[in-house]
Amino acid sequence: MKFHTVYVGKNTKIDLDFALQAQTNNFSSLEELRESFTNSGQTLSTQLFWKPVIDKLITDEGNDLTTIARTAIGENLFDLKVNLTDSVIDGTVLTKARKSFEERILNPFIEQRKEAKRIHDEEQARLERERKQLEEELKGKEKKVQELIREKTRFLSSFNNVKSFKDYWKGKGKNVEIKSQLIEVLKLAFKTDRNRTFIFLTDAFRNAVDWYYNAKKDDQDSKKKAFGDVGIELPKLGVDGIFIPNWLRWELKHRANLKLNLQSVTTKDIHNDINGWGVPKQIFWNEAKNGIEFRQTYPFKYAFQIRMKYTGDYGLKGIYWTLANWGLGGIPPEWKGEMELVLNVDGQLADWITSKKDYPGTLFQFRDDKLLFTLHITQWINVQDQRFKGLLKKQQLDVLEPWGGDIKVPVVDLASYLHFLILADKS
């Protein structure tokens, strides 16, 4: 039985289509069916259960809340005693069912959505107030042109290095060594100058990798505060830092006893090599949608390279060594030498990657105290041993791009890299 109604509140109008499905108890025998009926005088009645089904729930602003409403209702049932003498279902029953549906499901749901919208609007208003406050400061208290220029110069100069960034925002009453305040600062800076903030963050990404493994490698306190107990997200050390299928990682650790000893880590800006000379670093922000689309391709223009050199060895254990030594499977039974892992990090997220079902989304998104950022990686593994090199090529691991499945597209907290630089900088 289908219904259509329009609910008009103080600030909201909701267009609702729903149906009520009636059902009885399941009966295993004719005797149970008879017992479900009640005969009182001339009145024969029975117990029916009603299930509301939402067909459409749309606000006057065009927000389609149908799926959310269905989830909220779930498998709720309403039970009513029905007078079968008058009719299988009469207007009174319908009125009661409709009233029960409104009181138990619809009205609480409307209130929840109103409260969620209120919280969202308050947060947006707060950010807008802070953004406007920054704009007013940039314009200057006396609204003089020279003061506006000087303030804008100070803002842009804050991106020169980590110390300048800390000092500038300290003057604005923000302590960027606290992660939550750093996130607020980045939101404000991004609203003011998106590309300059993006460039600063991606450069910080590259520099943080260098500091983590070189200049500040012994600063365990800053490492833990920025990245937690698990350490830097990318690149990790050893076999855990190589993009390979999980089954192969397990084999290398447990059956091959692979050991890699880090010798050096270097980073290099390769933006011009990847994106072309004269092409600026930038983020392609959709102004109309105030963000980046979930499967947006080639969303960022930047690129840098991480080069990690190892010495290492492995030796297959037990029967696996014997089989390999006999030449089965094409796996060298042992190896010792140098290995170079090269990672190109950039924004070349092509359609063949973004169209995968398990693609995490093209993210440059503030979420809680994180700035989630989707990476495109091209990985090279170089070894001198021809047998080992042949194995890598056979497994298509000498050159690899994580695209999904067992080798997932990486997403990092971009803000954590800048946070590490800020904490580790003692100047």
UniProtKB/Swiss-Prot annotation:
Domain of life from the UniProt record: Bacteria
InterPro entries: DUF237, DUF240
Native source species: Mycoplasma pneumoniae (strain ATCC 29342 / M129 / Subtype 1)
Protein family: Belongs to the MG032/MG096/MG288 family.
Name assigned to this protein: Uncharacterized protein MPN_509
